[in-house]
């Protein structure tokens, strides 16, 4: 089943959005402090919400656990999969755009993988603070 799942994931996110080898996935499978380490069937890096939806539908259809991961900078290891190796790690790093900053309403719309430092730097250039 693993080969079928990998092929289906590849069809959704393409070469740039799929990592399966140990060397390619290592940085995703260890937390920021190096305290927690896990394994996964694949690291999937969608670029759109449509791709996220397709990955989630595939995982649901095959009863596969999905571990979401933003920047992997958390302190608790919650974005690190367990050691079973049968989950999909859903990295949102490629969904890193700032869609809108509305200075009047003091709000912004950003994608899930947008790094906090980027938000801070971008708003600071506009005389705002995040």
Q: How would you label these PLM feature ranges?
A:
Residues 23, 70-72:
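Short, ordered loop/turn segments at secondary-structure junctions
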């Amino acid at each position: 089943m693993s080969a079928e799942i990998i092929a289906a994931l590849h069809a959704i996110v393409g070469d740039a959005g799929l990592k399966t080898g140990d060397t390619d996935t290592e940085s995703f499978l260890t937390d920021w402090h190096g305290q927690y380490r896990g394994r996964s069937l694949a690291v999937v890096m969608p670029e759109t919400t449509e791709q996220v939806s397709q990955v989630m539908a595939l995982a649901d259809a095959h009863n596969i656990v999905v571990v979401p991961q933003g920047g992997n900078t958390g302190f608790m290891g919650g974005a690190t999969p367990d050691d079973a190796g049968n989950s999909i790690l859903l990295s949102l790093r490629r969904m890193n755009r700032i869609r809108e900053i509305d200075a009047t309403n003091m709000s912004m719309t950003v994608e899930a993988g947008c790094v906090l430092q980027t938000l801070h730097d971008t708003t600071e250039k506009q005389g705002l603070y995040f």
